[in-house]
Amino acid sequence: MSGGACIAVRSLSRSWTDNAIRLIEADARRSADTHLLRYPLPAAWCTDVDVELYLKDETTHITGSLKHRLARSLFLYALCNGWINENTTVVEASSGSTAVSEAYFAALLGLPFIAVMPAATSASKIALIESQGGRCHFVQNSSQVYAEAERVAKETGGHYLDQFTNAERATDWRGNNNIAESIYVQMREEKHPTPEWIVVGAGTGGTSATIGRYIRYRRHATRLCVVDPENSAFFPAYSEGRYDIVMPTSSRIEGIGRPRVEPSFLPGVVDRMVAVPDAASIAAARHVSAVLGRRVGPSTGTNLWGAFGLLAEMVKQGRSGSVVTLLADSGDRYADTYFSDEWVSAQGLDPAGPAAALVEFERSCRWT
């Protein structure tokens, strides 16, 4: 007590936290920015209109996907909020690329990591998470992952990262080399440096929130298009203006689409949404893989289906410009699923029609 005032002190040594942040920052400095690839569009149908398509290649992150950025931001957010210390078990609700990337950062800091996921998660994805040092905890239904992740974190005295709530707030959307700033810096010397459109999918909603906010903050004329797969609540919520929608089943396109509208999804920064059939996402992923000479993941197929439609619209309207989308992860992770004819058929999907539409698009720039 001093001068009659009561004092309460909770301050602890920050040496471990300081070092943890240093390790994450050092890891980032050792990594180059991801490439911005120019997609080879046919010149034949662009005689009067000059359009260009770019892919931001997020597969070159050390953990192989766009989710590396999110995982890094979530860890820094939790560390700077005092939620993680040297004795914390880190928990997440994820069966996908987010869990792979978060397991990497947990291992970097010497912390245990538990990913809560549906029991139906593929063996290959479980193996990827475990290869980064993570442990998988299973629930029967995908709707149970949120509550179970909270329970596991409480039981272990750990911290639930909660990507679905914190994705939009953990990333500095004003800049600091976020994905939006990186795109615009890399586009500076291109013929059409300010994209007409940026196309992304929505899983947590964090990427679309970051890009949409940045566009407005920097006063760019770019518009943001969000593509959404079947069985996702985002598109019907956006089109109907209702955010209490819950879907009875989960998205079949890995990494995007959710059965509920996640807290990080900000519809107010989205200019357009496109509902993409799952068969079209698969057909586009296979088509683009053949063009690039390497496999891309299914959500990249969803992105490209949306981007191709916008390019066709621009050509039809006689409007020159550029479109940018994301190459979210590698298709090598999906050899037994989206690139397996047997698996696709077992899902009741037939990509033949969309595949033919893509061939016609490249021939004539007509879009159906």
Curated annotation (Swiss-Prot):
Q: By what means is the activity of this protein regulated?
A: Probably inhibited by aminooxyacetic acid (AOAA) but not by DL-propargylglycine (PAG); the former inhibits pyridoxal 5'-phosphate-dependent enzymes, the latter only inhibits cystathionine gamma-lyase.
KO phenotype (gene knockout): Significantly reduced production of H(2)S in all media tested, cells grow significantly less well in the presence of 4 mM cysteine, no change in survival in mouse macrophages. 40% reduction in basal oxygen consumption (respiration rate), increased levels of amino acids, glycolytic and TCA cycle metabolites, decreased levels of the redox couple ergothioneine and mycothiol. Increased ATP levels in the presence of 100 uM exogenous Cys. Increased cell survival after clofazimine or rifampicin treatment.
Name the chemical reaction catalysed here: L-cysteine + H2O = hydrogen sulfide + pyruvate + NH4(+) + H(+)
Keywords, comma-separated and alphabetical = Cytoplasm, Lyase, Pyridoxal phosphate
Q: Which GO terms describe its biological process?
A: cell redox homeostasis; cysteine biosynthetic process; hydrogen sulfide biosynthetic process; L-cysteine catabolic process to pyruvate; positive regulation of cellular respiration; regulation of sulfur metabolic process
Q: What Gene Ontology terms describe what this protein does at the molecular function level?
A: lyase activity; pyridoxal phosphate binding
- Give all N6-(pyridoxal phosphate)lysine modified positions: K67
| Binding, pyridoxal 5'-phosphate | G203, T204, G205, G206, T207, S299
Going by the record, the broad EC class of this enzyme is lyase
Gene Ontology CC entries for this record: cytoplasm; cytosol; plasma membrane
What is the additional note? There is a large variation in the ability of different strains to produce H(2)S; H37Rv, CDC 1551 and 2 clinical strains were the highest producers of H(2)S.
Q: What does this protein do?
A: A cysteine desulfhydrase that generates hydrogen sulfide, H(2)S. The H(2)S produced by this enzyme stimulates respiration in M.tuberculosis, mediated primarily via cytochrome bd with a lesser contribution from cytochrome bc1/aa3. H(2)S modulates the balance between respiration and glycolysis, and also contributes to redox homeostasis. Probably eliminates toxic levels of Cys (which can induce oxidative stress).
The record ties this protein, via PANTHER family, to: CYSTATHIONINE BETA-SYNTHASE (PTHR10314)
Name of this protein: L-cysteine desulfhydrase Cds1
Organism for this UniProt entry: Mycobacterium tuberculosis (strain ATCC 25618 / H37Rv)
